[in-house]
Amino acid sequence: VGSEMCIRDRASTDPALRKEYTNKGFWVNIRLIRYADVLLMGAESANEKGIPGEAIDYLEQVRARARGTNSNILPKVTTTDQGELREAIRDERRVELGLEFDRFYDLVRWGIAKEVLHAAGKTNYQDKNALLPLPQTEIDKSKGVLVQNPDYQ
């Protein structure tokens, strides 16, 4: 009465995502980030802040779930050396999150993307690939606050 109503005749979301709605249109709890990822971020942060005990606690929570009851599968990480612990955390991220498409961004964040990718025979990586271009519309809206990332100007 006095207003128009538009009903879409097709869905624009992924069918798997549409299954996550209840019959009342509310979201069901969709997992956007895994708890193991959160724990590994905590481990990395604690290690970089020089708190190895906390880093090991986070790391061991992830490894304990993976090892189950067989402690021979994954021995406990006991090193408190920051460099060694950093490598253990990085390796755990590699195996725990291996098929979740975060590896490249981890390598970039750690500043080792070129080294690791070239060692794996992926020689088309360039330093400019560490950053993505900013959308020009966002740069324009910022009125000079944002500038385009290097190599994309």
Where are these regions (language model features)?
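Acidic/polar-rich alpha-helix caps and helix-coil junctions
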Residues: S3-E4, R8-Q153
